[in-house]
């Protein structure tokens, strides 16, 4: 008879433990129920990206000295730098610079290590196209500054700030 009593006690303890776990999950569910939805209506509403957002790379052709540091620090050797050595002035002259954003992982190493700061990250993140070859940007396409979301009057901007609980 004694083993039968311990089985009932274990069953009772397991029942109480299961009810407690279910109650904890229910409390978490109820705490999430009173939050505001996070969804936005994308084409008409856009989040303002943070200052350190890593979007499309902006390139300034005049500042580049063709040192190829960006190629060496890139984990996938992505930037294509074509240059010609000018023998009369003993300097490299940049001929072509291109980045394929279909392959780029937006790590920011090229921007970080560029000695002349000719590369910078913009807040542009809409790079989708129907043809993947359109994602190969040359120095002309990289030199264009993106249109700011804030300046577009057709788009309602939403600040992406964390809520402060009081």
From Swiss-Prot:
EC number(s) from the headed UniProt entry: 7.1.1.-
Q: Does the keyword Lyase apply?
A: no
BP terms from Gene Ontology: photosynthesis, light reaction
GO CC annotation: chloroplast thylakoid membrane
| Membrane topology of the entry | Peripheral membrane protein
Q: How does it assemble?
A: NDH is composed of at least 16 different subunits, 5 of which are encoded in the nucleus.
- Top class in the EC scheme: translocase
* Name of this chain's protein: NAD(P)H-quinone oxidoreductase subunit I, chloroplastic
| InterPro entries given in the database record | 4Fe4S_Fe-S-bd (IPR017896), 4Fe4S_Fe_S_CS (IPR017900), NADH_quinone_OxRdtase_chainI (IPR010226), NDHI (IPR004497)
Q: Which family does it belong to?
A: Belongs to the complex I 23 kDa subunit family.
Quick one: which residues bind [4Fe-4S] cluster 1?
64, 67, 70, 114
Which coenzymes or cofactors are required?
A: [4Fe-4S] cluster
Described function: NDH shuttles electrons from NAD(P)H:plastoquinone, via FMN and iron-sulfur (Fe-S) centers, to quinones in the photosynthetic chain and possibly in a chloroplast respiratory chain. The immediate electron acceptor for the enzyme in this species is believed to be plastoquinone. Couples the redox reaction to proton translocation, and thus conserves the redox energy in a proton gradient.
**Pfam families documented for this protein:** Fer4
Molecular-function GO terms, alphabetical: 4 iron, 4 sulfur cluster binding; iron ion binding; NADH dehydrogenase (ubiquinone) activity; quinone binding
Record's cofactor remark: Binds 2 [4Fe-4S] clusters per subunit.
- What organism is this sequence from? Palafoxia arida (Spanish needles)
Per UniProt, where does [4Fe-4S] cluster 2 bind? 74, 104, 107, 110
Q: Where in the cell is it found?
A: Plastid, Chloroplast thylakoid membrane
> Residues in domain 4Fe-4S ferredoxin-type?
55-84, 95-124
Q: Which reaction does it catalyse?
A: a plastoquinone + NADH + (n+1) H(+)(in) = a plastoquinol + NAD(+) + n H(+)(out); a plastoquinone + NADPH + (n+1) H(+)(in) = a plastoquinol + NADP(+) + n H(+)(out)
| Keyword annotations from UniProtKB, A to Z | 4Fe-4S, Chloroplast, Iron, Iron-sulfur, Membrane, Metal-binding, NAD, NADP, Plastid, Plastoquinone, Quinone, Repeat, Thylakoid, Translocase
**Major site of localization recorded for this protein:** plastid
